[in-house]
Amino acid sequence: MISSLSASSSLVSSFVAVKATPVTGPLIPRRDLLSIRIRASSNQNSSGYCFPEKFKSFAKSAILIGAAVSMTGKFSTLPVKAESPVTTIEKTYEEVKEEKLSEITPLSELLDSTPEAVETLRSLLQQKLEKGEDEEALKLLERLVAAQPEETEWKFLMARLLGEMGRPENARQMFEEILQRNPLSFEALFENALLMDRSGEGNAVLQRLEDALAVAEAEYLVKEARDVRLIIAQIHFLQKNVDEALKSYEQLTKEDPKDFRPYFCRGMIYSLLDKNVEAKEQFAKYRELSPKKFEVEGYLRTPLSKMKLFGGSEEN
């Protein structure tokens, strides 16, 4: 039986990371590495508080649903840490810290000429984040972004880290840079929308998404248009416009009954509403349609969410 989310956050944490093979094609462009960092916060265990309070307590579930909906591309789990000894990692990092971006040995040249350097720095970055050394991680990311401005993976990592460090405006600026290159990037649109909504720009965020939808429709990008509509539905839910969100998911299901994502989202919403019978029906349909290898992995329990390798077919 689907248990009520008003009693526990365990169901919420169980649907954060998703592995899957594409259903209707890769949802987002391929990126070599992506990190979603969310620190778990304790939720109220009382089931007696009113509907608005319940949504306030579980507002972060909107992030959860969006993450699950977005990650329908093929990707693997946490990469094996670099086999290089710690001393080698630290040595490379010291070289990066001491490197003055001179004409002789700029960091970009080091990364281009030394294949192991990127993986070594990636492993070091992961260590810094896991230890909560945010400032050190940010400094490293700033250098990586400057050295490899075309690599959106570093910008995604940096944006998410800035958001968690309480610097939403800087995070949004980074997402905007990503969107300048790929205006229909699902994750950049979604996460930027979340930041806008948290900043009290409720109407502006919906207009921003409507503009993105118009771009997709004007270019006859059916898949991208559908993805933006999924984000819009999610924002409606986040803004407590539950009926509108459910209506949107229902319309998306009518247009493509084989897409499991709207079923998943409706199941999550019904769970939040303690409508367990309806939630069970939606989750059953979602499991029926999702790929056989589709997995849901809870990793919200860790202080730092995992780094992942994406293996889609599209390029940014």
Swiss-Prot record:
Q: In which tissues is it expressed?
A: Ubiquitous. Preferentially expressed in newly formed green tissues.
One Gene Ontology term, aspect cellular component: cytosol
One Pfam family recorded for the sequence: TPR_16
Where are the bilayer-spanning segments? none
Q: Which domain of life is it from?
A: Eukaryota
According to the record, mutating R181K results in: Abnormal chloroplast development and slow greening
- Cellular localisation: Plastid, Chloroplast
Any one Gene Ontology BP term: chloroplast organization
> Per the entry, what span does the transit peptide take up?
1-39
Chain positions of TPR repeats: 118-151, 152-185, 226-259, 261-293
* PROSITE patterns with a match to the protein in the record: TPR, TPR_REGION
Sorted UniProt keywords: Chloroplast, Plastid, Repeat, TPR repeat, Transit peptide
Which PANTHER family does UniProt cross-reference here? CELLULOSE SYNTHASE OPERON PROTEIN C (PTHR44943), TPR REPEAT-CONTAINING PROTEIN MJ0798 (PTHR44943:SF4)
The entry's function note states: Required for the early stage of chloroplast development. May be involved in chloroplast protein biosynthesis and/or degradation.
Protein name from the UniProt record? protein SLOW GREEN 1, chloroplastic
Annotated organism of origin = Arabidopsis thaliana
